[in-house]
Amino acid sequence: MAFLKKSLFLVLFLGLVSLSMCEEEKRENEVEEEQEDDEQSELRRSLWSSIKDMAAAAGRAALNAVNGILNPGEQ
């Protein structure tokens, strides 16, 4: 009977350790995914910022070109 109790405690202990290790690995994976998401969000923000700046510059250039065509003597 004592052998059975020790075996049962050993199995329960090993199961608990295994579960703990799985939970820890799961948390680490979630943290890594969050970091990757943060990096991707930052890249998207910088990309959109660059696109916005280029569009603004293109708009200003187009406006200047139109003004130059409509008012050739005022430059």
UniProtKB/Swiss-Prot annotation:
InterPro entries attached to this UniProt entry: Dermaseptin_dom, Frog_antimicrobial_propeptide, FSAP
Domain of life: Eukaryota
An individual GO BP term: innate immune response
Residue ranges listed under propeptide: 23-45, 74-75
Keywords: Amidation, Amphibian defense peptide, Antibiotic, Antimicrobial, Cleavage on pair of basic residues, Cytolysis, Fungicide, Hemolysis, Immunity, Innate immunity, Membrane, Secreted, Signal, Target cell membrane, Target membrane
Residues recorded as bearing Proline amide in the entry: P72
Keyword Membrane annotated: yes
Localization (cell): Secreted; Target cell membrane
Gene Ontology cellular-component terms listed: extracellular region; membrane; other organism cell membrane
Short name of any one Pfam family annotated for the protein: FSAP_sig_propep
Secretion signal span: 1-22
The UniProt record lists the keyword Membrane: yes
Tissues showing expression: Expressed by the skin glands.
Function per UniProt: Antimicrobial peptide with activity against Gram-positive and Gram-negative bacteria and fungi. Has been tested against E.coli (MIC=47.25-128 uM), S.aureus (MIC=189-512 uM), K.pneumoniae (MIC=189 uM) and C.albicans (MIC>189 uM). Probably acts by disturbing membrane functions with its alpha-helical amphipathic structure. May penetrate bacterial membranes, but stay at the mammalian membrane surface. Shows a weak hemolytic activity.
Family per similarity comment: Belongs to the frog skin active peptide (FSAP) family. Dermaseptin subfamily.
Name of the protein this chain belongs to: Dermaseptin-SP4
Annotated source species: Agalychnis spurrelli (Gliding leaf frog)
